[in-house]
From Swiss-Prot:
One of its GO terms (cellular component) is nucleus. It comes from the Eukaryota. Keywords: Amino-acid biosynthesis, Isopeptide bond, Methionine biosynthesis, NADP, Oxidoreductase, Threonine biosynthesis, Ubl conjugation. It comes from Saccharomyces cerevisiae (strain ATCC 204508 / S288c). Transmembrane segments: none annotated. This is Homoserine dehydrogenase. GO terms for molecular function: homoserine dehydrogenase activity; NAD+ binding; NADP binding. Its cofactor is a metal cation. Optimum pH is 7.5 in the forward direction. Optimum pH is 9.5 in the reverse direction. A sodium ion is seen in the structure; a metal ion may subtly affect the relative position of the nucleotide-binding region to influence enzyme activity, and could increase the stability of the enzyme. Pfam families: Homoserine_dh (PF00742), NAD_binding_3 (PF03447). The lineage of its organism: Eukaryota, Fungi, Dikarya, Ascomycota, Saccharomycotina. Na(+) binds at residues 143, 146, 148, 150.
Amino acid sequence: MSTKVVNVAVIGAGVVGSAFLDQLLAMKSTITYNLVLLAEAERSLISKDFSPLNVGSDWKAALAASTTKTLPLDDLIAHLKTSPKPVILVDNTSSAYIAGFYTKFVENGISIATPNKKAFSSDLATWKALFSNKPTNGFVYHEATVGAGLPIISFLREIIQTGDEVEKIEGIFSGTLSYIFNEFSTSQANDVKFSDVVKVAKKLGYTEPDPRDDLNGLDVARKVTIVGRISGVEVESPTSFPVQSLIPKPLESVKSADEFLEKLSDYDKDLTQLKKEAATENKVLRFIGKVDVATKSVSVGIEKYDYSHPFASLKGSDNVISIKTKRYTNPVVIQGAGAGAAVTAAGVLGDVIKIAQRL
């Protein structure tokens, strides 16, 4: 029976954060995971002496009733540094501000598990600082930044550690854009309009509150930046390579999401034409992120695929990533749910377990 104890500090109790906490508190393990901090923007639960917070499954009520203000991040680092046991910080937010403190956490020996893409897809200097592997640094795991709980990042890191070399990666990295193109461009002829599919996707909750945040391609660009960097391409930033936006120029600046959706149908013509051209070649349209390690090139945009291609037969909002390496000349294909609270939280919890095993 292991006597290993790790202290877990959690920031964010939203949709993913809630699923993570429920999974963490229900988990059975030979390692003891003590929840010592639970923080939201304004209020928090904090154990000053690092004894486990006695909240159990009632953590929501305990947090809602708390009158303790959330510590500024510098103060939080100073507090966690004094922990007698190793600390894992779990950031379940998408905050760029919190991500900006990751290097400080890590340099103070605090490990990080997170689905937050911001730090890993920002400037290259931050990436290098986070993975400098200084012996006193905390560990950094971010499986859920690409493909939610799918084992994409862990697979890439593992094969590279064993001496394999990534040659090409291409894939459908966005659950939202997967759904939209799977409905819009099919092997069976259809008259579905792009604008109508976007409206349905929003109704079903697949898109961000403002669908332009999906259609601008930046979310895919961030994910491609991450897998590109892992594969050895020094991608400067998500805006340093070609990213095709699906937002018609005149609609980029309209004030509201409702106005955008209302006017989107005025611009269906170009994508309808592209769909028809693809159909005459027995192909479908998909929104793809690509990395070519040999040419150090990265891109995001619409591509055509034969009806027989794995990307063409995709259903729903699945992600699918194809990875070609020196050893895997026939590409490895990883497919499954690339979004959703439960699978994302499981990806984060898996990272917490991996870190704990190394501490």
